[in-house]
Amino acid sequence: MYQKPKPFFFKNENATQAIVLLHGYAGSTIDMRLLGRFLQRQGYVVYCNNFRGHGTGEPKDILVFGGIDYWLQDARDAVSYVRDHGYKDVAMFGLSLGGIIATKTMEECQDIKCGGAISAPFIFKVSDYFHEQFIGYANYTYHAQARSAVEIEKNDAYLRANVDQQVKQISTLVRKTNEGASALKQPFFLAQGTADEMLQQASAQSFQERLSNVAVTYHTYPNAGHVLTVNEAHHALENDILAFLNDNFKK
């Protein structure tokens, strides 16, 4: 049975600082819950919402209702949300495409104190594997809802015919984020698994090389795949992010 992933706002009565988490393309808040709970236990308030079109139970919604401009606004709205709740000091981390969006948001919003990108495609080259992963995610969602084979086939055809337009938007965002790297002034965290099947292996390092005037913390995770927040590397990732926050964010 499919259950729609919900936004989370993990509170801590002793917290004075907030962390915004952003999930990846075709992902949801589920991918960020382990990290969110960990950071809550360390004394932070943590907020994560689903990007528009995500987490609805209908993958076509990502294409119909989503888009880069909407998702950038979702990230800004998340910062406003925690500030409206009284937390003025904010850090931001994103996974995969969420990492690109977090980076772009930090380039534009200098009052975000620090943040980073986890498994982010700073080198974005689309392959058939990307499309198959997207269709695979969609079919997993449809099967969980017991959709008919005829309906799934029809929906798959729609996704294949329309995803490339959004891929072009993502490619443009990646290019602009790389070009805007000089605007980034905050301490920055980068993470990538050495067995990441979705990324070019030089992805994180390529962006690190653009940040000559920024304090950068860069970690690799041996034999770890793409979704570092939930795979076998998640404990190491959590502790590395905590150390980064202790150095750059903790009062």
Predicted regions and their residues:
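Active-site nucleophile elbow and catalytic-triad environment of alpha/beta-hydrolase enzymes
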Residues: 163-180
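Short beta-strand/loop motif that positions the catalytic acidic residue
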Residues: 184, 190-192, 196
